[in-house]
Amino acid sequence: MAAFPAYLALLSYLVPGALSHPEAKTLTSRASTEAYSPPYYPAPNGGWISEWASAYEKAHRVVSNMTLAEKVNLTSGTGIYMGPCAGQTGSVPRFGIPNLCLHDSPLGVRNSDHNTAFPAGITVGATFDKDLMYERGVGLGEEARGKGINVLLGPSVGPIGRKPRGGRNWEGFGADPSLQAFGGSLTIKGMQSTGAIASLKHLIGNEQEQHRMSSVITQGYSSNIDDRTLHELYLWPFAESVRAGAGSVMIAYNDVNRSACSQNSKLINGILKDELGFQGFVVTDWLAHIGGVSSALAGLDMSMPGDGAIPLLGTSYWSWELSRSVLNGSVPVERLNDMVTRIVATWYKMGQDKDYPLPNFSSNTEDETGPLYPGALFSPSGIVNQYVNVQGNHNVTARAIARDAITLLKNNENVLPLKRNDTLKIFGTDAGTNSDGINSCTDKGCNKGVLTMGWGSGTSRLPYLITPQEAIANISSNAEFHITDTFPLGVTAGPDDIAIVFINSDSGENYITVDGNPGDRTLAGLHAWHNGDNLVKAAAEKFSNVVVVVHTVGPILMEEWIDLDSVKAVLVAHLPGQEAGWSLTDILFGDYSPSGHLPYTIPHSESDYPESVGLIAQPFGQIQDDYTEGLYIDYRHFLKANITPRYPFGHGLSYTTFNFTEPNLSIIKALDTAYPAARPPKGSTPTYPTAKPDASEVAWPKNFNRIWRYLYPYLDNPEGAAANSSKTYPYPDGYTTEPKPAPRAGGAEGGNPALWDVTFSVQVKVTNTGSRDGRAVAQLYVELPSSLGLDTPSRQLRQFEKTKILAAGESEVLTLDVTRKDLSVWDVVVQDWKAPVNGEGVKIWVGESVADLRVGCVVGEGCSTL
């Protein structure tokens, strides 16, 4: 999330995190009453990884000469609505560092103009196409750079989709850690290739929208996650994305194991910065900052948007309060220096010191001129929107993603593709436009017309929208449209007529409630919105041939109509963005064969899921959200519980057929030890003088013109703050300035580099055995042996590759690599990744879904077709 309406922001409230629990060595599995996040201090310094050495050297030279005010300026936001972006830091003009602009969203520039509204993350995941994941990242980065955004707030790999009703699952790439990992890491590589900084989010456990934030009434919920589940499931995509070089990580609102993420020292210091070797800076989600000294010591580097518990009052936990904390000694100057060095090093690492644009847009108004600081009572005005067009040819990428994500679930009697002269009757408002205007609802906070994205801060304005109605009318010579959610009277149906029924299911962020759903799908559940099920059934009674097109944020129930004889075909078009119409007609009329695959499971009933993944209501006191299902979410649960879903994870049909033959398993690097080779030692980190700065460095400059509510680093009485340094600060239990031994699972960005040694490689020949062109996806799942002594899911997606467009009879050999980490479990005692020696007992499966396996391999025995 980033900025949201002021009246909702006022609900934010300071609640101290729980930091005084009995000592524990690991995050073992516990009941909620025992959930505990152990202390991990001090915060590790950045700069010890060679890939970042040059950037840190440049940062060190600059930070060494900064004043206290200049340092604090870069760590703190200037206040909500106090600039053009969702958030901005202060600046250091003396060294050419501007106010850094942090802005949404993961699918395009939010609240701007002349930008691309790309398909959502869940749509990208459904492509199973690594090239498109990267290309979208490049497009996002180019548009962020073009608008002068230093830090684009995305991608999102958390939530992962633990809760099917969760409001923001659609911002990520699917309900699997590996799919999320590829989506996140490739997006980051693409974005940062342009010089824009990616902010990976939300770390961690923000799997439900309701009750995530602390308020005047209660504390945000605690996601209670055991150590193994944390590493193997929720942390997995973060580790891969850190390995990709993420410049920033955004901390979530909620608690993890009863410690607020923004001041959870185990999570930030211990796991993210030490074990995963993260070299960039850690930033809060908007208004997730709930403590000053505690968060600094826990490893937080930047506060956004800078305000305190109640925004718009000009208060802050940092800004001048951080200046005070450094002067009185409660925050060590070493910690501040590392905070600033991480920020400046990231700025240098992405080359933003070289002709990077300043913001040329305003997220606060569409007018050309307006207040420069809208959150101030009195603000100077000027040009705030220059209407810079940053779209380039990104519409091509957007259309390709939306098209290649479309997932064909059912196609009885090959009713699809359609012919241009077929008699078509189209039903449902989801086929049309929002009659109030395509951008009439703030942050897409309504469900009117075709569903292009969910709602909330993860959205973008549509530069244009080609609806399915417009696209079909442009192609079909005989189409009749009924843009209504009630089946109309008097509709005639010929024996060969085809009805196309459009339905959808929406969700979003919890600061907006749409049709009774406060972010999460509380009221609608997993059912279609706007009478969708009844509309399909009514069409099925009238027509012999019905095609259902679904735009949805995630799993949707189909049981009321899926088995009706006249429902011949079902397409899931996910959330297609601006190219909703053209991408759909590309598939409907057969210009392309569908090649999308489900990035989640579609159940028969919500009761098919474990009870623990349901939405949780607000009791008196803090909600304890216990992850008692452990590793078993989505398809992993269905397999373990022996429940056959309506459609399995990875399912997707084509207009053609494919054969998988000639499988081969190669040993690339022997797994001759259970644990990876010893980690590389840490390199040196920048050092600075440890003396406290002079109090005069944060005195108000003479004749300074203050902007009301703008957050500054200056103190009215800095000498008084320094005089209080003799007082003893009540540090959290376990706080120390003595560095901890380097964790054995670390050693580089993402962890021990030996974890990414390719151990096995599977080659398989994919042949188009049908009569139409098409693309196939080979999905690789691993099954780990019981000899590891742990219960593991019977199938875990670890790799996938997609063929080029294959003509009828054409073949392509795909290579799918398997790493040491892919075959490892997290050892909570040793605190390292453990694999079966020599891969003994490992089974590898390749197929077109988790339930449609075409190749089976056993390490040491070879492969066979199934």
Curated annotation (Swiss-Prot):
It is an enzyme of class 3 (hydrolase). The active site is at D285. Belongs to the glycosyl hydrolase 3 family. GO terms for biological process: cellulose catabolic process. Glycans are attached at N65, N73, N257, N328, N360, N395, N421, N474, N659, N664, N724. Pathway: Glycan metabolism; cellulose degradation. Its main location: secreted. It comes from the Eukaryota. It holds the Pfam family Glyco_hydro_3_C. Keywords: Carbohydrate metabolism, Cellulose degradation, Glycoprotein, Glycosidase, Hydrolase, Polysaccharide degradation, Secreted, Signal. Its EC number is 3.2.1.21. InterPro entries: Cellulose_deg_GH3 (IPR050288), Fn3-like (IPR026891), Glyco_hydro_3_AS (IPR019800), Glyco_hydro_3_C (IPR002772), Glyco_hydro_3_C_sf (IPR036881), Glyco_hydro_3_N (IPR001764), Glyco_hydro_3_N_sf (IPR036962), Glycoside_hydrolase_SF (IPR017853). This is Probable beta-glucosidase F.
